[in-house]
Amino acid sequence: MYKKLAIATLLYSADYLPGVFALGHQVNKLLEEAGKKGDIETCLIVTTSLFNGTLSELAKNILQSIYTKIVLVEPLNCQEESIQKNSENLALLERPELSFALIKARLWELTQFEQVLYLDSDTLPLNKEFLKLFDIMSKQTTSQVGAIADIGWPDMFNSGVMMLIPDADTASVLQNYIFENTSIDGSDQGILNQFFNQNCCTDELVKDSFSREWVQLSFTYNVTIPNLGYQSSPAMNYFKPSIKLIHFIGKHKPWSLWSQKNFIKNEYHDQWNEVYEEFKEEHQLNNEVSKPKISDSDKTETPETITPVDAPPSNEPTTNQEIDTISTVEENVDNQNAEPVPNSDHSPAPNPVPLDFTKWLTTFINKDHLTNQPVNESREYSKENDNNIINSSSNRDQESPPNSTQELNSSYSVVSTQADSDEHQNAEEEDSTTDNASNSGEESHLDDISTAASSNNNVSNQPDGKNFSNSKENNISVESSPSNPEQKRSTDNIQKPSVSTNDLPDDVEPHTSVDDNIQYLEKDKEGYEEFLPDVYESNAIDNEEEFFDDDARDATEGETKTSAVADKQEDMKLTAEETNQPQQEMPNFKFDWEDSDYLSKVERCFPDDIFEYAVE
């Protein structure tokens, strides 16, 4: 085993500063746990312009307390040309910031160390077992690189975790190779594979004599976790006890603002947050620094200057800085108000509860054309919806079996004919005075029937113009109604659907909702449907007794009994026929509403405060 060992990481953008803090804190903790705190150094490689021009004094002091050695480096001499050359391949990754990762070639210049374990700043060692890599690669040569297969293409290695031997000659050859060749992915991983990985050699003759070698290590030393939640669950469960290190690949990191809101949380994401909270407690930053809000937007960063940068006259951040993640207490007051500091018990912050429960309830409903509707229009939608329901019920009533209604009409017409003939005979026997009285009683009784029909129409919910009665039903004689109460009830039921809009007040429209009809009935306290037949039947019978003598009444009662028996038999036949007829199936509302525009309006039926009780 080599004597001078180091664990190094790279900081080329302030966006990765939280990852550098958490990684350095965790590595020091595990080194102390393994008893190798003095045997293995921690090293941070950072660009000179970033360290002197962007980071604050507080950030610099913290970095110097975490890492035993900080190495300032300049961009590669060929970096501008390499960025332009690799721009097309880099665009495929949609990761423009990776163009600066070519500075990772500077790792082989760390000749002050004999062996280096490189870790990306978005990695998190889980336990001290990751230090076994030094034992596994104890006989490594300068032409070898120890790395783990990439999850995207296993014939290539992931450059986030690498074991390497610093060497000046290798560093020089590598930098020239970067200048002369185009990276597969436009970034450091592609070009390092082309340089060290024998699998990337397309020429079979050259492949056999390839001078450099990739030593493949176990995947448990670099378990890549994409932030979209994709992973091989069975393998993760099986090898979970053996995992030594987690790598948060992708553009969204655990500390980024997008991840804090949208990331599919898992135990490793929570573990990173716990480590970061421990780091803040150790450095007493809970009252000074809130959780950093790193923007996830893809920014086209300008290449850093190649010329060496002298020490600036002051350490204040420049005006062209990308982001000042950690600053003084006064600069972070707004950050504290913007996002609360997590609890000191290291428990992960709970997911925010959506306050707009109406939007949450109708997540699968297309509401685009209703989002900008005013409140009064939403009420109109509610009324239209109620009218649609009323119209549908009236249509169903109208579509009732026509045979039954026709047969009833025919039977009632026969009864009317018989009653008219009896009336004609009685009229010849009576004198003119009796005829006049009879006519006056007839008119009064027709008024009663008209009043009852109008009252029943107020109770019904049928729309205008839906008159189901024919001319024969409207011409029913006076004698047929009082002589047979059951016949009168049936006649009233047939006349009931007819609507008389003249009885409604002027301020009530015919096409109103059910609530308006109920309010109107409350104003008119008389005329309930179930009591109407008894009222006008009793009055009609009293009037009849005044105008008919005993002989005429006996004859009429005989005819009435005969007609009543015939009517009962006819009703029994109708009931049997209705029983034999197939019952009309009601529409399946569970599926019919999918074809209508009901869903576009249903959200407006919910009051805005319906879910307020659930919000604390």
UniProtKB/Swiss-Prot annotation:
Compositionally biased region (Polar residues): 400-419, 462-485, 492-503, 577-586
Residue segments, region Disordered: 283-320, 335-354, 371-525, 553-588
EC number(s) recorded for this UniProt protein: 2.4.1.186
UniProt key word Cytoplasm: yes
Induction and repression of expression: Induced during the diauxic transition.
GO terms of biological process kind: glycogen biosynthetic process
Glycan-linked positions: 230, 598
Cofactor: Mn(2+)
Biased composition (Basic and acidic residues): 283-302, 377-386, 567-576
Molecular function in Gene Ontology: glycogenin glucosyltransferase activity; glycosyltransferase activity; metal ion binding
Annotated site location: Important for catalytic activity: 104
One GO CC annotation: cytoplasm
Protein name: Glycogenin-1
Biological source species: Saccharomyces cerevisiae (strain ATCC 204508 / S288c) (Baker's yeast)
Gene designation: GLG1
